[in-house]
Amino acid sequence: RIVSVEMIEHMRNHKKLFKKISSWLNPGGLFFMHIFVHKTQPYLFEVQDKDDWMSKYFFSGGMMPSEDLPLFFQEDLKIINQWSWSGKQYENTANAWLTNIDLNKNKAMSVLEEIYGENNAKKWFQRWRIFFMSCAELWGYKNGNEWKIAHYLFKK
C-alpha cells in the first residue's frame, strides 16, 4: 500500500508519477491519494510577476489539479473509488493554524529565524499568516464547493 497526503499537488507529470507508483506496488496493491482540487479547472503554480508570492514561496513548480484530472491517468493504476469533500473543513483548519501561529508567535519566530535567518523571520511570519488566510478564503469560497479535498483509491 501507498498513501499520499497533499503531495501530488507538487507534481506535474502524472502519467510518469502513476507509472512509478505502480512499479512500487505488488499486483493488486493499493494507492490512496488525498489531494486538494479545484472543482473543474486544473492550473499551474507559476510565478507570473513579483506579486505572485504563493506560487513562488509555497507551491513552486506545482499545480492545482481539477477533481477529474487523476482519472485521466489509469494506464498503470485503476480507480476503485473516489470521494469529494467540501473545502469547509480545510477552511476551518487554515483558520485554526492562523490562530495557533498568532498565539505562539514567539515560538514561531524562533523557528523561522532558524530556518530563514533573523533578517527574514518577520517577513516569513507574515507570509505564513497570509498563506493561512488565503487558504481559508479559497477553500471556504462558495461554501467549500469550488476548491475541495478529494480522495482516490487506485489498484494495480
Where are these regions (language model features)?
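A conserved beta-strand element that flanks and buttresses the S-adenosyl-L-methionine
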Residues: 3
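A short His-aromatic
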Residues: 9-10
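Substrate-binding/catalytic lobe of Class I Rossmann-like enzymes that use SAM or dcSAM, i.e.
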Residues: 37-149, 155-156
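Residues at alpha-helix caps and immediate loop-helix transition turns in enzyme cores, especially N-
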Residues: 13-14, 93
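Short catalytic micro-motifs in class I SAM-dependent methyltransferases
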Residues: 6
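Alpha/beta-hydrolase-fold catalytic nucleophile elbow
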Residues: 34
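A short glycine-rich, Lys/Arg-flanked "PGG" loop and its adjoining helix->strand segment in the class I
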Residues: 15-30
